[in-house]
A protein has these predicted regions:
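Intrinsically disordered, low-complexity acidic Ser/Thr-rich regulatory segments
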Residues: 279-308
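Transmembrane alpha-helix/interfacial motif
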Residues: 95, 101-116, 167
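Short intracellular "coupling" helices and adjacent cytoplasmic loop segments at the cytosolic face
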Residues: 113-117, 134-138, 254-260, 290-298, ...
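Short amphipathic alpha-helical coupling elements at transmembrane boundaries
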Residues: 125-135, 247-254, 299-317, 382-389
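C-terminal transmembrane module of eukaryotic multi-pass membrane proteins
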Residues: 251, 346-353, 359-452
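Inner-leaflet juxtamembrane helices
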Residues: 109-131, 235, 242, 366-390
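Helix-loop-helix junctions within predominantly alpha-helical proteins
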Residues: 2-99, 132-237, 243, 253-278, ...
């Protein structure tokens, strides 16, 4: 069983690192491995090392997938409209509520996948630039804690989110197959499909039913993995950007040496940093003249400013590539959470889990995006705090001016928005949940009123 999971899931590292504080580009590449695997399943190229001939087949298969989804979306829309039009009572129209979350996911997956394909050079540039920033060789204990902590969080979150969506697929797609097996063994079980497509033929006829069921299963897998791949990329980029912000903040805190005296107590963080510099670099830290420190500070501040500008620019690329999809995603999430909750409460039996798993996955996906958005905000604030606490008052006038300019920019904060409407943060998650709850209670009260009049 373990070997099967490793073959078709995500492989564990076969060897333990000999020196945990030594990092290479391979560690960075391994953080992208799960996402690249999911992208490969839906034929979306993203820094994949494949031949030119394979690239053509990948592109053809992707557009074949998109052609299917372009047919699926209108088919579901027509089915929902016809179901609502033909319904004689409110209870007959409840089928529409079951179809709404699925239709929303189809539209969202199409938008996300096209965005990844059309703007693939921008996504690859983000990957390559963050790779160039990745630390190589042995790092300090504090840097190791920053990097290893970020990678562990990313590993747990990415794998957890991946298997959460797989659980959704299994719970949502398996019931019709169980019913088919039951009929095969002689039981009187109804025929059911995953989704209610409008089709020009009767899909419940022999042979047609089996073919339609398999095609709908494939459509569901494509939709889910389109969404999963996009969400993973967003989390990956923000994870590495926030890691670089934290490493930059650590570097800023060690920019200036401040003598520990009666004014600077040894227990203060700045004093601890100065003592560490003294321990690492020796007594020459105290004996160097002003010219040495001016030259050193100029070189280090120049590198810090360039890195800060690069991170701001990369965050802007993330904003440009993801913001519109995030806006659609969050609007869609409120509706999906509302209708999934409605289906869980009033339509599904207690032992049915399809829409319950759908609800859990929708809540998890929204929280994941908001949590990494909050991490970006917090890491940019930590850089501003580091600039203020770095002992700049003990430096030359030129260095103080440079730090003041950086501090002024860092205090503005770095964040990603939903196309300018709201900032992606945990506060946004709270707003989405409140909105979904308002829709849910309104729909529930409307249903109770209609049921009472029957």
């Amino acid at each position: 069983m373990t070997s099967i999971l490793r073959k078709y899931g995500f492989k564990r590292k076969s060897k333990q690192r000999f020196n945990e504080k030594v990092y290479t580009k391979k560690d960075y590449d391994e953080s992208y491995a799960p996402t690249k695997k999911v992208l490969g399943w839906v034929a979306i190229r993203m820094t994949h090392s494949i031949s030119e001939n394979a690239t053509k087949w990948w592109d053809r298969f992707y557009w074949f997938e998109m052609f299917n989804l372009f047919l699926t979306g209108p088919s579901e829309m027509v089915s929902m409209v016809s179901t609502a039009y033909e319904a004689k009572t409110f209870l007959d129209s409840i089928k529409v509520f079951r179809m709404m979350p699925c239709f929303g996911c189809v539209v969202l997956s199409m938008f996300k996948s096209i965005n990844m394909v059309i703007h693939r050079p921008v996504f690859e540039n983000l990957t390559n630039e963050l790779r160039a920033m990745w630390p190589q060789g042995e790092v300090s204990e504090e840097e190791h804690e920053i990097i290893s902590g970020a990678l562990k969080q990313l590993n747990i979150i990415v794998k957890g989110y991946y298997w959460c969506n797989n659980a959704l697929l299994i719970s949502f797609l398996s019931p019709p197959y169980f019913l088919t097996l039951a009929r095969y063994f002689g039981h009187d079980s109804p025929m059911g499909l995953h989704f209610l497509y409008w089709l020009p033929f009767d899909p419940y006829q022999p042979v047609y039913y089996e073919i339609t069921l398999v095609i709908q299963t494939w459509h569901a897998c494509v939709v889910i993995y389109f969404n999963v791949a996009w969400d993973m990329l967003f989390c990956l980029f923000l994870c590495h950007i926030t890691t670089q912000f934290d490493l930059l903040a650590r570097r800023v805190r060690r920019l200036f040496y401040v003598t520990v005296d009666q004014q600077l107590v040894r227990s203060y963080p700045m004093a601890l940093v100065s003592e560490e510099m003294l321990r690492v670099e020796g007594e020459r830290v105290r004996s160097q003249g002003d010219n040495y420190w001016q030259t050193r500070h100029h070189a280090e501040i120049t590198q810090i400013v360039l890195r800060h500008h690069a991170l701001i620019r990369l965050t802007g690329d993330v904003e440009q590539m993801f913001s519109l999809a995030l806006l659609i995603n969050f609007m869609n999430s409120s509706i999906i959470i509302c209708f999934c909750g409605f289906c869980c409460v009033l339509i599904e039996e207690w032992n049915e889990v399809a829409y319950k798993s759908f609800l859990v996955t929708a809540l998890t996906q929204t929280w994941l995006l908001c949590w990494y958005g909050q991490k970006l905000i917090d890491s940019s604030k930590r850089l501003a705090d580091a600039l203020y606490d770095c002992g700049w008052y003990n430096a030359s006038k030129k260095a103080r001016s440079a730090v003041l300019i950086m501090l002024h920019r860092a205090q503005k904060g770095i964040y990603v928005t939903t196309h300018g409407f709201s900032v992606i943060s945990l506060a946004s998650y709270s707003t989405i949940i409140k909105t979904a709850w308002s829709y849910f209670t309104l729909l529930l009260n409307f249903f109770k009123d209609k049921s009472a009049n029957l």
